[in-house]
């Protein structure tokens, strides 16, 4: 993938860029692997906003991705197409299996149209193949990693991400996450070889607010710029600091987003913030 820069013909075009989509081989998705994706606008069942800055955007259909691949062990598949997916930053690959079934997987770097991929403990070590962690050589870069055996891939699924397999000891494999966190995972968990493609996605300059609206992202407004009815930091004469510690619109302390005491916390060897420099 490469980045194509626009000429500065308008203020919105100045400095903006777009992916060149050179790796895309088909523009229309496989109909049998589509499902409706109704828009929620960030609202829950009561109509209250639970996810801010969401709404609008171009209409989409969800592409059904195979994140397990366990039921196709030993069945080779040919990469028919590399396609664009509006629901994720990674590209997706359409596989035609030898038994006639079609499925989507996340497209790793260097996977091309016409390649043969397979899954199972005896699969070759090449991009796109899916194996248990106990069968993958130490030092290999992997993606699409499960947290629990048979639970489906949860880690390293976005564009340009990859996890390094540092070692194995007993029933666990040690992995280095893209964030720098080091954690242990059951060796029965499965992973795909290689890193996710489309790594230049993070270098795209969107250029104008309108392009973000096409993606379904709404503006981020500061609480101190609102009225008291809309936010605990709102109101006051002139500009204010908010008058209290930062809170969200519901009045809960801002910044704490992760639940303490996750069952998998005991498997974390080193947290990601341990590598940061403290100033």
Swiss-Prot record:
<dbReference type="GO" id="GO:0003735">
    <property type="term" value="F:structural constituent of ribosome"/>
</dbReference>
<dbReference type="GO" id="GO:0016740">
    <property type="term" value="F:transferase activity"/>
</dbReference>
<feature type="compositionally biased region" description="Basic residues">
    <location>
        <begin position="40"/>
        <end position="58"/>
    </location>
</feature>
<comment type="subunit">
    <text>Part of the 50S ribosomal subunit. Forms a bridge to the 30S subunit in the 70S ribosome.</text>
</comment>
<dbReference type="GO" id="GO:0015934">
    <property type="term" value="C:large ribosomal subunit"/>
</dbReference>
<comment type="similarity">
    <text>Belongs to the universal ribosomal protein uL2 family.</text>
</comment>
<dbReference type="InterPro" id="IPR014726">
    <property type="entry name" value="Ribosomal_uL2_dom3"/>
</dbReference>
<feature type="region of interest" description="Disordered">
    <location>
        <begin position="32"/>
        <end position="58"/>
    </location>
</feature>
<dbReference type="InterPro" id="IPR012340">
    <property type="entry name" value="NA-bd_OB-fold"/>
</dbReference>
<dbReference type="InterPro" id="IPR014722">
    <property type="entry name" value="Rib_uL2_dom2"/>
</dbReference>
<protein>
    <recommendedName>
        <fullName>Large ribosomal subunit protein uL2</fullName>
    </recommendedName>
</protein>
<feature type="region of interest" description="Disordered">
    <location>
        <begin position="223"/>
        <end position="279"/>
    </location>
</feature>
<keyword id="KW-0699">rRNA-binding</keyword>
<dbReference type="Pfam" id="PF00181">
    <property type="entry name" value="Ribosomal_L2"/>
</dbReference>
<dbReference type="InterPro" id="IPR005880">
    <property type="entry name" value="Ribosomal_uL2_bac/org-type"/>
</dbReference>
<dbReference type="GO" id="GO:0002181">
    <property type="term" value="P:cytoplasmic translation"/>
</dbReference>
<dbReference type="GO" id="GO:0019843">
    <property type="term" value="F:rRNA binding"/>
</dbReference>
<dbReference type="InterPro" id="IPR022669">
    <property type="entry name" value="Ribosomal_uL2_C"/>
</dbReference>
<feature type="compositionally biased region" description="Basic residues">
    <location>
        <begin position="269"/>
        <end position="279"/>
    </location>
</feature>
<dbReference type="InterPro" id="IPR008991">
    <property type="entry name" value="Translation_prot_SH3-like_sf"/>
</dbReference>
<dbReference type="InterPro" id="IPR022671">
    <property type="entry name" value="Ribosomal_uL2_CS"/>
</dbReference>
<dbReference type="Pfam" id="PF03947">
    <property type="entry name" value="Ribosomal_L2_C"/>
</dbReference>
<comment type="function">
    <text>One of the primary rRNA binding proteins. Required for association of the 30S and 50S subunits to form the 70S ribosome, for tRNA binding and peptide bond formation. It has been suggested to have peptidyltransferase activity; this is somewhat controversial. Makes several contacts with the 16S rRNA in the 70S ribosome.</text>
</comment>
<keyword id="KW-0687">Ribonucleoprotein</keyword>
<keyword id="KW-0689">Ribosomal protein</keyword>
<dbReference type="InterPro" id="IPR022666">
    <property type="entry name" value="Ribosomal_uL2_RNA-bd_dom"/>
</dbReference>
<keyword id="KW-0694">RNA-binding</keyword>
<dbReference type="InterPro" id="IPR002171">
    <property type="entry name" value="Ribosomal_uL2"/>
</dbReference>
């Amino acid at each position: 993938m490469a980045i194509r820069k626009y000429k500065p013909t308008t203020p919105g075009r100045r400095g903006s860029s777009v992916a060149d989509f050179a790796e895309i081989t088909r523009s229309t998705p496989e109909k049998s692997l589509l499902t409706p994706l109704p828009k929620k606008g960030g609202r829950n069942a009561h109509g209250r906003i639970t996810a801010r800055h969401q709404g609008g955007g171009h209409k989409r259909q969800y592409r059904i991705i195979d994140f397990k691949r366990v039921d196709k062990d030993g069945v080779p598949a040919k990469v028919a197409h590399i396609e664009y997916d509006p629901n994720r930053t990674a590209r997706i690959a359409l596989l035609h299996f030898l038994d006639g079934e079609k499925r989507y997987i996340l497209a790793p770097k260097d996977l091309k149209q016409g390649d043969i991929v397979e899954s199972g403990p005896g699969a070759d070590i090449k991009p796109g193949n899916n194996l248990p962690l106990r069968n993958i050589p130490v030092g290999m870069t992997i993606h699409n990693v499960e947290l629990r055996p048979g639970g489906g891939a949860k880690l390293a699924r976005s564009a340009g991400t990859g996890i390094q397999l540092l070692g194995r000891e007993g029933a666990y494999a040690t992995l280095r996450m893209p964030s720098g966190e080091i954690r242990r995972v059951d060796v029965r968990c499965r992973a795909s070889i290689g890193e996710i493609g489309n790594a230049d996605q993070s270098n795209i300059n969107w250029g104008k607010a309108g392009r973000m609206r096409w993606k379904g992202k709404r503006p981020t407004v500061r609480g101190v710029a609102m009225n008291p009815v809309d936010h605990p930091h709102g109101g006051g004469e002139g500009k204010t600091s908010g008058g209290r510690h930062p809170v969200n619109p519901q009045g809960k302390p801002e910044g704490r987003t992760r639940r303490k005491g996750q069952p998998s916390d005991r498997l974390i060897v080193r947290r990601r913030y341990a590598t940061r420099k403290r100033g």
